[in-house]
């Protein structure tokens, strides 16, 4: 207990000496953060031992001491990296290397020379907001090389130059949505107006009014596809319409008016032909009538009900008169009979029991014929040939599926073809240094759970060379299962955002 208090007092004394000396060197700033790290470790150890006070200093919770120690370690690493650059001999104060300055916008950058920027909304002096523009900004590129750049302000926002690009870290249009009623603001630097009131309707090329790049790129493509009248395009559209019609399942089919004259012609033939030929035409007519529209089916249903009532009376006559009555039935007017009645007339003289069974099984026989027609070998082969499951995946379909592959595919080939439509990736957004550190850790810690990492990159405005938003990085995977395993195991750094996506090729 006493030794721990003595060590803590020694660290406090060393910190006081650093504050009194106020040296403006990187070496002094590194020593300052190393001392803060030792202090946090001492307080953490004291809390573990159940000590609540070290002298007059209360011991904080373990989580607080741990966070302070990690923060000090991170700042030491950044300052040691800056010490190896060409800016090590510049003057660096405690304010320049503090966490408050380092984490202010633009985040995770060393900055010097704050300049106040006042933005007045709706021409109201009381409705104003203050921002900080930094004269110099120090950033590290993708090759871990430090650069020094200047910062500026315009009607869009406050930015710093990343090479030749303008990287905005403050956008006035974002705050205008909250503070402004008319969407107008005025920019003042050091109490001097540098930009007169402007509206929030900025041009599409600027970051404040940037439109969705996918919308501008997809619109002409859709128009071209719609106006293309080449024979190849027409044949493809016709095939797609046929495939779409077959996938409707049991939906309503369009009524085919061209089949009615053909059906009428077949009926007229069945009236004039013999008893055997009428049976053949009656089955064809029944099959054709089954696939008519709903209105035609209603009319035929009524006709069937009338034919059944007529057939019952006729069957009674056949039972009374024997075989001679069936001969009289064939000599009657053809307009009273359909092809279905001619088929029923063959069984009227065979006895009462068989006649009853034939009448009751008429509906089931019709359903069996309908089922056999829909599941015929030709139709099943035709659907199987046109099904994309057995045709493979065309280049235009790769990456277009939005849902993950389910368990409906029993074969391995079908699952591989479905997964080929959606090569999975993860888009990570954050600070460039944070993303690079995360990439280096993930390569060793999560080996085998990913395919590859990309370098950091940024989006550029449509009509300019200004960088938009934070840095990006892509993580590719071999399949959706690998991406899910990676997402379950990985722990992203603080402030890093991610989203799912897919690409046509990697």
Swiss-Prot record:
Composition bias (Basic residues) maps to 248-274
Which residues does the annotated region (DNA-binding domain) include? 422-506
Q: Where is the composition biased (Low complexity)?
A: 196-229, 275-297, 310-339
Gene Ontology CC: host cell nucleus
Q: What are the protein's UniProt keywords?
A: Activator, DNA replication, DNA-binding, Early protein, Host nucleus, Phosphoprotein, Repressor, Transcription, Transcription regulation
Question: Could you confirm whether the keyword Iron-sulfur appears in this record?
Answer: no
User: Which molecular-function annotations from GO does this UniProt entry contain?
Assistant: DNA binding; DNA-binding transcription factor activity; nucleotide binding
Chain's role: Plays a role in the initiation of viral DNA replication. A dimer of E2 interacts with a dimer of E1 in order to improve specificity of E1 DNA binding activity. Once the complex recognizes and binds DNA at specific sites, the E2 dimer is removed from DNA. E2 also regulates viral transcription through binding to the E2RE response element (5'-ACCNNNNNNGGT-3') present in multiple copies in the regulatory regions of the viral genome. Activates or represses transcription depending on E2RE's position with regards to proximal promoter elements including the TATA-box.
Q: Any idea what this protein is called?
A: Regulatory protein E2
């Amino acid at each position: 207990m006493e030794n721990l208090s003595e060590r803590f007092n020694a660290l406090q004394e060393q910190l006081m000496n650093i504050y009194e000396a106020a040296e403006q060197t990187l070496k002094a700033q590194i020593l300052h953060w190393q001392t803060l790290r030792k202090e946090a470790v001492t307080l953490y150890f004291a809390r573990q031992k159940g000590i609540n006070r070290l002298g007059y200093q209360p011991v904080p919770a373990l989580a607080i001491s741990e966070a302070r120690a990690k923060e000090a370690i991170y700042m030491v690493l950044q300052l040691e990296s800056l010490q190896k650059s060409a800016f090590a001999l510049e003057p660096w104060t405690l304010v320049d290397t503090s966490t408050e300055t380092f984490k202010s916008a633009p985040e995770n950058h060393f900055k010097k020379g704050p300049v106040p920027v006042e933005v007045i909304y709706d021409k109201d002096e009381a409705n104003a907001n203050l921002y900080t523009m930094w004269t110099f900004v120090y950033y590290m590129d993708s090759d871990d090389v430090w650069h020094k750049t200047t910062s500026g302000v315009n009607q869009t926002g406050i930015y710093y130059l990343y090479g030749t690009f303008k990287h905005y870290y403050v956008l006035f249009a974002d705050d205008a949505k909250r503070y402004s009623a008319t969407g107008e603001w005025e920019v003042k630097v050091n109490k001097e107006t540098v930009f007169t009131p402007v509206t929030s309707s900025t041009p599409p090329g600027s970051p404040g009014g940037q439109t969705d790049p996918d919308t501008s790129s997809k619109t002409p493509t859709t128009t071209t596809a719609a106006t293309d009248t080449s024979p190849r395009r027409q044949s493809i559209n016709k095939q797609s319409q046929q495939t779409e019609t077959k996938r409707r399942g049991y939906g309503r089919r369009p009524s085919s008016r061209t089949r009615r004259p053909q059906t009428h012609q077949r009926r007229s033939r069945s009236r004039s032909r013999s008893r055997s030929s009428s049976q053949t035409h009656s089955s064809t007519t029944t099959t054709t009538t089954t696939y008519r529209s709903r209105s035609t089916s209603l009319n035929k249903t009524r006709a069937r009900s009338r034919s059944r009532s007529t057939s019952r009376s006729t069957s009674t006559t056949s039972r009374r008169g024997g075989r001679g009555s069936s001969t009289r039935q064939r000599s009657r007017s053809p307009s009273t009979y359909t092809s279905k009645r001619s088929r029923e007339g063959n069984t009227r003289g065979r006895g009462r029991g068989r006649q009853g069974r034939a009448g009751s099984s008429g509906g089931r026989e019709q359903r069996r014929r309908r089922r056999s027609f829909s599941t015929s070998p030709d139709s099943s082969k035709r659907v199987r040939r046109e099904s994309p499951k057995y045709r493979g995946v065309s280049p235009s379909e790769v990456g277009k599926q939005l849902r993950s592959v389910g368990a409906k595919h029993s074969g391995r080939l079908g699952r591989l073809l479905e997964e080929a439509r959606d090569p999975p990736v993860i888009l990570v957004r954050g600070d460039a240094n944070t993303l690079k550190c995360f990439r280096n850790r993930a390569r060793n810690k999560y080996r085998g759970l990913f395919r590859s990492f990309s370098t950091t990159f940024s989006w550029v405005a449509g009509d300019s060379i200004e960088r938009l938003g934070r840095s990006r990085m892509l993580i590719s995977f071999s399949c959706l299962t690998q991406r899910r395993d990676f997402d379950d195991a990985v722990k992203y750094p603080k402030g890093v955002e991610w989203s799912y996506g897919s690409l046509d090729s990697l």
